[in-house]
């Protein structure tokens, strides 16, 4: 019985009809309402956390691009240790620069000295194989960042899809119980089935109240993730192009 209080608080703040419907629900209906309520808590937690993360990522991405484009050499921020870790672009940049350093070090150059001496061009030149290696590192990192941004989005998609069906299940179950009681009592009076039907319909209402915010939040977050994914792809191409211009082959 105590577990029912998980759903009592929000329902008690609603009008008397919703509270009455919950009270007259079957145990299965109450259980479904409680499950939906708990799912709603997790859904809102994921949406709020994810939205804050996306806002910070967008802001840090803007700052990172401004700082990167102000420098004369593509590896300047890497050398200066100017980190923008909240931006999904920064890991791409960091690992690409690290790969560049590995390639140049394999040619007998000290990466730090080489970068500092290459602000206005480099005496070292990179061939297509070396550029492709750096590009592959950048693209793999971009894929990893895309997966990180999409983490927990599956839960929101599941909530959007499953909540209405779970509510519908509760409604069908409740209506079935209501008609069973009508047969048991041997009466077709509306007063005999109305309480059970009211409780049954409550699960659909709660299911929709969970699904609608989930759907809106999912679409908003998907739009931001799509925008950042495009930013990552564009930056990856820009970075490789800048590296080619500074270390172009003879």
Predicted regions: what is each one?
Residues 1-25, 187-189:
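Short, strongly hydrophobic alpha-helical membrane anchors
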Residues 31-48, 159, 163-169, 206, ...:
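Lipid-exposed faces of alpha-helical membrane segments in multi-pass integral membrane proteins
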Residues 59-165, 175-189, 214-250:
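Predominantly long cytosolic amphipathic alpha-helical stalk/bundle segments
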């Amino acid at each position: 019985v105590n577990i029912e209080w998980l759903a009592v608080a929000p329902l008690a703040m609603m009008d008397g009809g919703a509270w009455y419907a919950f009270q007259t629900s079957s145990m299965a209906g109450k259980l479904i309402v409680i499950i939906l309520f708990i799912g709603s808590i997790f859904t809102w937690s994921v949406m709020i956390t994810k939205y804050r993360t996306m806002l910070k990522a967008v802001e840090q991405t803007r700052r990172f691009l401004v700082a990167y484009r102000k420098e004369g050499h593509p590896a300047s921020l890497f050398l200066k240790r100017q980190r923008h870790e909240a931006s999904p672009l920064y890991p791409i940049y960091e690992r690409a620069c690290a790969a560049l350093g590995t390639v140049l070090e394999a040619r007998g150059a000290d990466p730090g000295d080489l970068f500092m001496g290459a602000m206005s061009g480099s005496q070292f030149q990179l061939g297509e194989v070396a550029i492709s290696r750096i590009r592959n590192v950048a693209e793999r990192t971009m894929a990893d960042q895309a997966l990180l941004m999409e983490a927990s989005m599956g839960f929101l998609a599941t909530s959007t899809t499953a909540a209405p069906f779970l509510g519908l299940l509760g409604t069908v179950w409740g209506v079935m119980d209501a008609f069973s009681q009508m047969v048991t009592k041997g009466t077709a009076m509306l007063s005999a089935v109305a309480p059970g039907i009211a409780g049954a319909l409550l699960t659909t209402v709660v299911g929709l109240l969970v699904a609608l915010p989930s759907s809106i939040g999912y679409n908003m977050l998907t739009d931001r993730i799509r925008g950042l994914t495009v930013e990552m792809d564009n930056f990856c191409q820009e970075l490789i192009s800048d590296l080619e211009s500074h270390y172009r082959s003879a």
